[in-house]
């Protein structure tokens, strides 16, 4: 307090602050997802230098574990030291130069963000538009590829977080290869939640996030590039417009050479957390992780339908880890979500873009994808809807979910 009384030191806050202790929530929205306690413990381990030999060894393990979850042997595989949006920017700023052309598929919010990245690189974005709530149309994509033989890459969102839709990544990558385009995939929500095979499907560049089905803390973005894409980066005619995201520089640190070149101070403790999250996926098994997400999704669907609610997306292209649920016009979206948060400490998401105010986005991602959370969500949502005047039976919804297991 003596320092505050010194007239030469001005404190602009209204009062002295105390340590922040967040409430304990169950996170069943579009992300971030609940963080496994093991990962939180890893985050609190002693910080070491980012060039410490022990840390360098751990970096090599992180790379190998990322290769496992991506199902790739790509040498250029690493976590970008920033959220998934930076992973997206890393891909486009490294692969595109001014005057290039990219075909971008948009069936939700995040295809639009791809377009913005392309144009900020000085490249042309050729858009393939599909209705929100539907998968990317393969025929439209092939028409665009035929009409633009000079396109450098084809980019699409595998699991569109704003709509809960899964597009056919394997078929889209095959089209890209057929027309000699690089295949670029947004896997922010799909990684570890649904089938994803980078090498087998011919994906050239992919980016994800740590805060979805990996159940890690937000702030890192795993990326991977095929040798074909890496060659494009090495042979650029102009420097990458972002110094921080320039992979030609970053790989001096992540490249695995005997001597690591300092590029930036890595987020050491966040990388501990990522390492632990990837170890957890490895322990469970990647296919088992996919199956768990699918199993809990089936249970949630049964319970939601028992409550008389319906889904936006057709079952054939519906994401198991993110569910868009329609609600009656008589229901106040904000009131329901507020009640869930205040009475049950349960977070679900609101609609984005064209779906704002029309749907809930209920996530079952990573550590949050559990039977316990399915039952909690159905019981809590049912109780709140009944308070809002709907004739629903929360217990019957939970029973319907249990019968699917």
Predicted segments with their positions:
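PLP-dependent enzyme catalytic core of the Aspartate aminotransferase-like
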Residues: 13, 354, 358-405
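A glycine-/small-polar-enriched, mobile loop at the entrance of the PLP active site in fold-type I
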Residues: 24-81, 85
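Active-site C-terminal subdomain of aminotransferase-like
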Residues: 34-35, 211-302, 306
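Conserved beta-loop-alpha segment that forms the PLP phosphate-binding cup at the N-terminus of a helix
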Residues: 75-103, 107, 111-115
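Active-site phosphate-binding strand-loop segment of PLP-dependent enzymes
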Residues: 136-192, 205, 213
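Conserved active-site segment immediately N-terminal to the catalytic lysine
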Residues: 199-211
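Conserved PLP-binding catalytic core of the aspartate aminotransferase-like
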Residues: 310-343
């Amino acid at each position: 307090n003596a320092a505050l009384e010194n007239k030469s030191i001005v404190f602009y806050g209204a009062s002295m602050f105390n340590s922040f202790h967040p409430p304990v929530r169950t996170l069943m929205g579009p992300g971030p997802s609940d963080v496994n306690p093991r990962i939180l413990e890893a985050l609190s381990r002693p910080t070491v230098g980012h060039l410490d030999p022990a840390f360098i060894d751990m970096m090599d393990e992180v790379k190998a574990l990322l290769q496992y979850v991506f199902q790739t042997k790509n040498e250029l595989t690493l976590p970008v030291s920033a959220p998934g949006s930076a992973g997206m920017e890393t891909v486009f700023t490294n692969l595109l130069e001014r005057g290039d052309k990219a075909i971008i598929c948009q069936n939700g919010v995040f295809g639009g963000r791809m377009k913005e990245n392309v144009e900020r690189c000085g490249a042309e974005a050729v858009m393939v538009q599909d209705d929100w709530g539907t998968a990317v149309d393969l025929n439209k994509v092939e028409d665009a590829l035929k009409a633009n033989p000079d396109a450098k890459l084809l980019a699409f969102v595998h699991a569109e977080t704003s709509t809960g839709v899964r597009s056919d990544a394997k078929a889209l990558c095959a089209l890209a290869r057929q027309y000699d385009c690089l295949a670029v995939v947004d896997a922010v929500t799909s990684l570890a939640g649904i089938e994803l095979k980078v090498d087998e499907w011919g994906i050239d560049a992919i980016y994800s996030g740590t805060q979805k089905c990996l159940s890690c803390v937000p702030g890192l973005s795993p990326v991977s590039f095929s040798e074909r894409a890496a060659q494009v980066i090495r042979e650029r005619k102009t420097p990458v417009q972002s110094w921080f995201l320039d992979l030609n520089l970053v790989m001096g640190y992540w490249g695995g050479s005997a001597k690591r070149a300092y590029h930036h101070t890595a987020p050491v403790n966040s990388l501990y957390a990522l390492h632990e999250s990837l170890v957890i996926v490895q322990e469970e098994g990647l296919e088992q992780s996919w199956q768990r997400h699918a199993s809990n999704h089936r249970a949630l669907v049964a319970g939601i339908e028992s409550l008389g609610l319906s889904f936006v997306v057709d079952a054939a292209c519906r994401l198991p880890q993110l569910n868009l649920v329609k609600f009656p016009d008589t229901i106040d979206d904000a009131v329901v979500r507020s009640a869930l948060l205040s009475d049950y400490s349960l977070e679900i998401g609101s609609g984005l873009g064209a779906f704002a105010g029309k749907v809930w986005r209920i996530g079952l991602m990573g550590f949050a994808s559990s039977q316990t959370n399915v039952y909690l969500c159905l019981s809590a949502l049912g109780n709140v809807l009944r308070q809002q005047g709907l004739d629903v039976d929360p217990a019957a919804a939970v029973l319907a979910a249990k019968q699917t297991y």
